[in-house]
Amino acid sequence: MLDHSEKVLLVDSETMKTRAEDMIEQNNTSVNDKKKTCADCGTSKTPLWRGGPVGPKSLCNACGIRNRKKRRGGTEDNKKLKKSSSGGGNRKFGESLKQSLMDLGIRKRSTVEKQRQKLGEEEQAAVLLMALSYGSVYA
């Protein structure tokens, strides 16, 4: 049989256990109350959270893919432009630019259209102005 001190210890351990469980439950509910939302579109339901400019797991799946494509697209365009403009180191700048503009005229229509779509309004104007100044395009 249990004496009085053992009963007190048993009751104290049970109350401590229930208090700990209550604290854990309160913690879980407070975490669940704060719904995670996408930093871009604000959605709270997604099959996968992706990293973005705000931090890891801050974007929903769709926004994360879109963000990654934007970042990749810019770097690939820069690489292509660097490769096409670097050509030969001993040529003059004007000759390499003229060659690039001539290549632009020779390329297929679809690739030229894609390139124009990627360029902004100011970039298109700059390319046309350079083409006019080198005489490869007539007004």
UniProtKB/Swiss-Prot annotation:
Keyword vocabulary terms for this entry: DNA-binding, Metal-binding, Nucleus, Transcription, Transcription regulation, Zinc, Zinc-finger
Zinc finger (GATA-type) boundaries: 32-86
The record's listing under Pfam families reads: GATA (PF00320)
**UniProt cross-references to InterPro entries, sorted A to Z:** Znf_GATA, Znf_NHR/GATA
Claim: Zinc is one of the keywords in the record: yes
Q: Where is this region: Disordered?
A: 67-98
Q: What function is annotated for this protein? A: Transcriptional regulator that specifically binds 5'-GATA-3' or 5'-GAT-3' motifs within gene promoters.
**How is this protein named in the record?**
GATA transcription factor 16
The organism is Arabidopsis thaliana (Mouse-ear cress)
* Gene name of the encoded protein: GATA16
